[in-house]
Regions:
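Short, surface-exposed ligand- or partner-binding patches at beta-edge/loop junctions that are enriched
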Residues: 105-106
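Conserved G/P- and acidic residue-centered "switch" motifs that form tight phosphate/ATP-binding loops
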Residues: 110
Length: 177
C-alpha cells in the first residue's frame, strides 16, 4: 500500500494484487522514477480528450462506450449506456509499459482501474497499483450542498495535481491496424 489504509478502499476498487495508491502518492511515485513508473489512464478516449487528463499519462481505454436504447446499462449509467471491453487492452499495455516496471492505473473513480489491474495481473504484470479515487474522485453526498452528486471529493483533479487538455500523440490511444 503506497499511502492510506486498505480499509479505506471501496470494495469495487479492490484488486487481486492488493496494491493501492491515492493521487498524491501516485504523483510522488512518478516523480521519484518517471523512467520506470508509468501512469496508465484507462478511461475512454472521449473522457481523456474532453474531460482532461494527466499530461504524462498513457491512454489505453479498458472499454469502448456503446449505446443501445434496448440494451442494459452499466452501473450508474442511463438506460442503454454500456461498454464493450477493449479486446486489445492487455496487448496495448504490453506495447507501452514493460511488465517489470511499476504501473499506476487511473480511471474516473477507481472501478475500471480495479478491473484493468486484475486483467494485467492475469497477464503476468506484478507491480500494478489502482489509483483508488481516479481522476474525477468520489461524488459529494450532501443534499444541502450545491455540489451534491458531483465528483468533487478527492481524485487527481480535486487534489490540485497537474492535469490539462494538451495532447501528446505518443501517449494517446491508437486503434491497432
Amino acid at each position: 500500500m503506497a499511502d492510506q489504509a486498505v480499509e479505506e478502499v471501496a470494495e469495487s476498487n479492490k484488486t487481486t494484487l492488493g496494491l493501492y495508491v491515492w493521487p498524491q502518492g501516485a504523483y510522488a511515485m512518478w516523480l521519484a522514477d518517471p523512467q520506470h513508473v508509468h501512469l496508465l489512464d484507462v478511461r475512454t478516449f472521449e473522457e481523456y480528450v474532453f474531460g482532461g487528463h494527466v499530461e504524462f499519462a498513457k491512454n489505453v481505454p479498458l472499454v469502448f462506450p456503446r449505446f443501445n436504447p434496448e440494451g442494459p446499462a452499466m452501473p450508474g449509467r442511463p438506460p442503454g449506456c454500456s461498454g464493450e471491453l477493449n479486446p486489445d487492452f492487455v496487448a496495448a499495455v504490453q506495447r507501452v509499459c514493460p511488465p517489470t516496471d511499476t504501473i499506476l492505473v487511473m480511471c474516473a473513480t477507481g472501478g475500471r482501474g480495479a478491473m484493468a489491474v486484475n486483467l494485467l495481473a492475469e497477464a503476468g504484470f506484478t507491480t500494478v497499483y489502482n489509483i483508488v479515487t481516479g481522476f474525477e474522485g468520489d461524488r459529494v453526498d450532501d443534499p444541502g450542498s450545491v455540489f451534491h452528486g458531483k465528483h468533487m471529493r478527492n481524485g487527481w483533479k480535486n487534489a490540485g495535481l497537474p492535469w490539462g487538455y494538451d495532447f501528446h500523440p505518443d501517449l494517446m490511444w491508437e486503434e491497432p491496424t
